[in-house]
Amino acid sequence: ELEKEFQKQKYLSTPDRLDLAQSLGLTQLQVKTWYQNRRMKWKKMVLKGGQEAPTKPKGRPKKNSIPTSEEIEAEEKLNSQVQSQELREPSQGLEGLCDTQEPKARVVPVEVAESPGQAQELPVTSPEPPPSS
């Protein structure tokens, strides 16, 4: 029954999902999950040259419907442009902090003569790596 409905309609509205779940004795979550899994399987088949072509969802349109791949790509492109702009132009508030902050001290284990075999951690402020022994 789920497979028949899927062939007719790739996306279910909430009322359709509720009706189908009740008619099959399943929960809405079970039907929703089955449809999500089945759509993924269907999309893989389509991409590998299956016989069906992707179609737009039928039934009642929703205000917050699932975006198309074109909408997703456009949004990702917009987000990447915004991120690259932020990298080139850091916000005003952070610039002042960078100039005045001192480098953070690194904690490096140092051997101490009074306690052989035990390392004592001391802060080191120089940017050079610790000498290798």
Curated annotation (Swiss-Prot):
One of its GO terms (cellular component) is nucleus. Residues 45-133 are annotated as: Disordered. It comes from the Eukaryota. Keywords: DNA-binding, Homeobox, Nucleus, Transcription, Transcription regulation. Residues 1-46 bind DNA. Gene3D superfamilies: Homeodomain-like. InterPro entries: HD, HD_metazoa, Homeobox_CS, Homeobox_TF, Homeodomain-like_sf, HTH_motif. Pfam families: Homeodomain. Transmembrane segments: none annotated. Expressed in keratinizing epithelia such as wool follicle, tongue and esophagus. Expressed at low level in thymus. Not detected in spleen, skeletal muscle, brain, heart kidney, liver and lung. SMART domains: HOX. GO terms for molecular function: DNA binding; DNA-binding transcription factor activity, RNA polymerase II-specific. It is found in: Nucleus. Belongs to the BAR homeobox family. Transcription factor. Binds optimally to the DNA consensus sequence 5'-YYTAATGRTTTTY-3'. May control the expression of neural adhesion molecules such as L1 or Ng-CAM during embryonic development of both the central and peripherical nervous system. May be involved in controlling adhesive processes in keratinizing epithelia. This is Homeobox protein BarH-like 2. It comes from Ovis aries.
